[in-house]
Amino acid sequence: MARRYDELPHYPGIVDGPAALASFPETVPAVPGPYGPHRPPQPLPPGLDSDGLKREKDEIYGHPLFPLLALVFEKCELATCSPRDGAGAGLGTPPGGDVCSSDSFNEDIAAFAKQVRSERPLFSSNPELDNLMIQAIQVLRFHLLELEKVHDLCDNFCHRYITCLKGKMPIDLVIEDRDGGCREDFEDYPASCPSLPDQNNMWIRDHEDSGSVHLGTPGPSSGGLASQSGDNSSDQGDGLDTSVASPSSGGEDEDLDQERRRNKKRGIFPKVATNIMRAWLFQHLSHPYPSEEQKKQLAQDTGLTILQVNNWFINARRRIVQPMIDQSNRTGQGAAFSPEGQPIGGYTETQPHVAVRPPGSVGMSLNLEGEWHYL
């Protein structure tokens, strides 16, 4: 660390000593600078030749405090160009450590003082040189403190930036959880209603003529989708039950508020909201794309935002409507479902009744009056 000046690399073309200074003429014109004109190089003091310069350099390099000065200078370079990894910095710390902290410098001074005192005194016989070395170490120490402030500001900025990013990320997590909840809500539809894709066009046409869909518990003669999905409803909000059509009492309102808060934390929509949007979806299967006004009305009815309603219908078209189309294309029985709402085949206008009953499932039939019956 405390290399001699003669051992340091010298570059070709650079002449050291008084000869280099003597090569400049004394009549060099003064060049204006930001702080006034520059003075031409002054001749060396009498008696200061190359031997005198070498002797003074040897005194500086041989001073007891020079190793500490070189160490602080090296720490300044490392603190400027190397990232910090949080490791403690002391004597022998590899490059890239936390070299610009106050604790590191204090440890270096303590270790250096302990090492030097056991060998030789800290000062030389030249008080002027001692003062120069101390001032140089202090200047580098101030430089380290300023670098430490810069690192602290950088750490503070990074911490605040990461905190801001973490505050934004739960939105994506909520959307992902909501997609998972919608997947659980809609998984039972293709399995519980395998014959529904073959007959949904007639159901849509009849209910569009009537202008509404009954969300309450239907009677024996009109047991339909609401009845079946109501029987198969789960805790996640499956089915169209009577809670949509009937008013709630004070206790039920309290339960709904608690359920809404709980579902909000879990990223799942309330049961009432999903029932309303699911009813609209099955009522408009011919064109399951609500307009902006319809989205606004659904948002008011469900208590959700327009963006949440829009995302729910995007997921519903992917997880409900598309599986119904795929199921209809795979089975090939009855009237295949088409997104335009027109039956591809399977019945004619003269047919009074259409019924499909796959093996191992509950059969359902739909007559031309728009009434569902269990087989």
UniProtKB/Swiss-Prot annotation:
The entry's DNA-binding region: 262-324
Gene Ontology molecular functions: DNA-binding transcription activator activity, RNA polymerase II-specific; DNA-binding transcription factor activity, RNA polymerase II-specific; sequence-specific DNA binding; sequence-specific double-stranded DNA binding
Annotated InterPro entries: HD, Homeodomain-like_sf, KN_HD, PKNOX/Meis_N, TALE_homeobox
MEIS N-terminal domain boundaries: 96-179
Biased composition (Low complexity): 227-241
Cellular component, GO annotation: chromatin; nucleus
Keyword Protein biosynthesis set for record: no
Keywords attached to this entry: DNA-binding, Homeobox, Nucleus
UniProt region (Disordered), positions on chain: 25-51, 197-268, 329-348
Coiled coil: none
Highest taxon in the source lineage: Eukaryota
Cellular localisation: Nucleus
GO biological process: angiogenesis; animal organ morphogenesis; brain development; embryonic pattern specification; eye development; hemopoiesis; positive regulation of cell population proliferation; positive regulation of transcription by RNA polymerase II
Family: Belongs to the TALE/MEIS homeobox family.
Protein name, entry field: Homeobox protein Meis3
Gene from which this protein is expressed: MEIS3
